[in-house]
């Protein structure tokens, strides 16, 4: 290589490296997106295996009666109040939550571990998750204790002793059907009589969380909504990347067992390895106990414009494991979580900008209205730094056609950067819009990422 050419090439590389470092440095005003290169663990995405595949399910278990239909209907209104997550499950409790583990049918594996299965059921449930307390008589639980969870679907999820806390119950993943099968796996040096297990409550879903109707039934969004794949930008790398950063959130309140849906966005950062930073709304996750129950659903979209259930993306992936709250500001409705498990391959770490959004900007929103497959809405920023419903520093967006709904809460307000990529600028609080609303009500409000970036910038760089 010619000496001058070589020096020029080195200079270009140095400048590129410097730019990359500047974007990753604390206090940087923006950052481009990036494709995920890590692989989620099979245990957290439903690809675990039973330790004893041929074991029988013990008759002993916990069984819950179905809740009154009017209670289920009352819990999930068609138009929840702005600033509230969409409720999709109700809590059921029992007066006899304990299971005597010594009464189960135990079978040893070839390596000496002890395994047993038992059912947790709720009459008529389309989907189900359970709160489980498992502890030794001394209180602490060995890390090598395993729990496997399965329902009517093919997924088998896994949790270990380190996932369970003596301070609060562990909420299982949401499974399909009215019966959750639990396999308990104990190390060779631990006996069933050494443990106490109880199931104080379950969260009951009257409709399937994963097979929600696409134009009728639970999860069906309004008629004005636009499938994400129908957007004119669909098929471009920038837009498809932005959709791959968005996930449906499902979480449960330990106080009453109610389960809820919001939308969130995975954010890029300069850490190595990357941290799983996840942006949503403060009104979705109120405390750490709730954050610990979070599971995210990725790639939940149709592959054809206005497709029915048969066109659901076959790559839909459920990620369990919960999250930790890094930042929460109820007044501004901002929330930054860190997922405890690595998202699946193919997700995108969304770029962002901490520069205040300009009035008149074109805004984009990719979201899960009523828990439906991903939808796309586009609108114009008509006011910044406003107060609405007691919340401050919000950005107002006016919608000409498609709007947002319950379940869309927390979804990212995006703008397009000079290079054509998308940048997150805030998260959805809510507002008066609905399909068919008059022009005066076709607007909603988003939090402002730039207004809290000084508080959270340390999480985006080493």
UniProtKB/Swiss-Prot annotation:
Belongs to the peptidase S1 family. Changing residue 327 to A: No loss of activity. GO terms for cellular component: extracellular space. It comes from Pseudomonas aeruginosa (strain ATCC 15692 / DSM 22644 / CIP 104116 / JCM 14847 / LMG 12228 / 1C / PRS 101 / PAO1). Residues 25-211 form a propeptide. Its EC number is 3.4.21.50. This is Lysyl endopeptidase. It is found in: Secreted. The keyword Hydrolase applies.
